Regions:
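Short, hydrophobic alpha-helical segments
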Residues: 307-308, 339-353
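Nucleotide-sugar donor-binding catalytic core of glycosyltransferases
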Residues: 2-55, 60-76, 84-92, 115, ...
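A short, histidine- and acid-enriched strand-loop-helix "catalytic/donor-clamping" loop
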Residues: 105-118
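Short, conserved structural micro-motifs that define repeat-unit consensus positions
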Residues: 83-85, 97-104
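Conserved acidic donor-binding segment of nucleotide-sugar-dependent glycosyltransferases
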Residues: 290-296, 305-310
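A charged, aromatic-enriched C-terminal amphipathic alpha-helix characteristic of glycosyltransferases
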Residues: 308-340
Length: 354
């Protein structure tokens, strides 16, 4: 068990957010957490004001956000402030927290250095040298952050949440599954084209669930494959359970090494058919703990191989679940890595040594 800290956790609340899963992990790991959802500062003003503020990260709402962070720190006197992708944080706020003897942590799943060129990173990039620790998702990000002046950066991975993402009951079988080949998520990269080819060219019995972004599909394809909308929490878990084959893709436009969804599918005991990528191959053994594809054609071949083979899918899904647990692809294990890194950082900040 890592050393217990008093933590001010600045993150978006709500059961739909993985930041809440991380909060639960901290509490299970014996941390004293004061959670604060400050997203309302970013919601001030009309639509145009919000869009401009998000791009520039400046103005009265940004200043108010930073004053509130410092107020909460004064009231609660934490050992550390953990920022879960807080784009409104100003460098001066982090310097003030350090002067107060409070360590600061930045946890960000997304990639400010990727080719996707998402807006909103202007102020964030300026804060990189001021955080005491960055927790990032990619090997390349370690270099990226250090080149920007990061004091310390370590890699941890996304994870499944064991309290909500667990396997189905023991007697669960194909008679309980009404989704043949399934994808639950967003149409990043070329996924819409991939799904279109699966359904139109190869007649794959496909079901897609997710946000309204899937309206980018051709209307005929959309009407044929899209159902149930966005799935969260219990609905997401049961969507995985009800799927004979669960697809997972790497987001190349974010330079991701692995897919968060892969750990969730494995954690929930689903049969995982995922894109072949080095980060996946390091974490799951091919045809033992999951199946892989590198193209639409190979994906179709794997579907034809495994869709009629319920016993084979069950065997691989069970091995994938065992690997996810044994190798620590869960939130507790991943958050523990960050907390252990803080065991030397927090005392150093308190002594004014950083």
């Amino acid at each position: 068990m890592p050393r217990p800290f008093k933590m001010l956790y600045i993150a978006e609340a709500g059961l739909h957010n993985t930041s809440t899963h991380r909060l639960w992990a901290f509490e299970r790991l014996g941390q004293h957490v004061v959670a604060a959802d400050l997203t309302h500062f970013g919601q001030r003003g009309g639509e145009l004001v919000r869009k401009v503020r998000f791009r520039l990260q400046m103005g009265p709402a940004v200043n108010a956000f930073n004053r509130e962070v410092l107020r909460l720190a004064l009231v609660h006197q934490p050992d550390l402030v953990w920022m879960d992708k807080q784009l409104m944080t100003q460098p001066s706020t982090l310097r003030t927290l350090r002067q107060m003897g409070i360590a600061t942590v930045n946890y960000t799943i997304d990639n400010p250095f990727g080719p996707r060129k998402d807006p909103g990173w202007r102020l964030y990039l300026k804060t990189i040298p001021e955080y005491d620790l960055h927790l990032v998702q990619r090997d390349q990000n370690i270099t990226d952050y250090k080149q920007r002046g990061a004091r310390e950066a370590i890699k941890i991975q996304t994870a499944f949440e064991p309290t909500t993402q667990f396997p189905p009951p023991p007697q669960w079988s194909d008679k309980d599954r009404d989704r043949e080949v399934s994808f639950i998520g967003n149409p990043y990269d070329q996924r819409a084209e991939f799904m279109t080819r699966l359904w139109r060219e190869f007649d794959v019995p496909l079901t897609v669930s997710g946000s309204a972004r899937w309206k980018c599909l051709d209307r005929e394809v959309y009407d044929a494959v899209f159902r149930e909308g966005e799935l969260y929490d219990k609905d997401y878990r049961e969507g995985i359970w009800r799927s004979k084959i669960n697809l997972s893709f790497v987001t190349h436009s974010n330079l991701d090494e692995f897919a968060h969804k892969s750990f969730e599918i494995a954690g929930m005991g689903g049969f995982l058919l995922q894109e072949r990528a080095p980060g996946h191959l390091e974490r799951f053994i091919e045809d033992v703990e999951c199946a892989y594809f590198s193209s639409v054609e190979e994906c179709v071949a794997q579907i034809k191989r495994y869709l009629p083979d319920e016993a084979g899918r069950a065997r691989i899904a069970a091995a994938g679940r065992q690997r996810a647990v044994a190798s620590g692809y869960d939130n507790d294990t991943q958050m523990r890595k960050g907390l252990e890194a803080l065991e030397t950082i927090v005392p150093a900040v308190k002594r004014g040594m950083r």
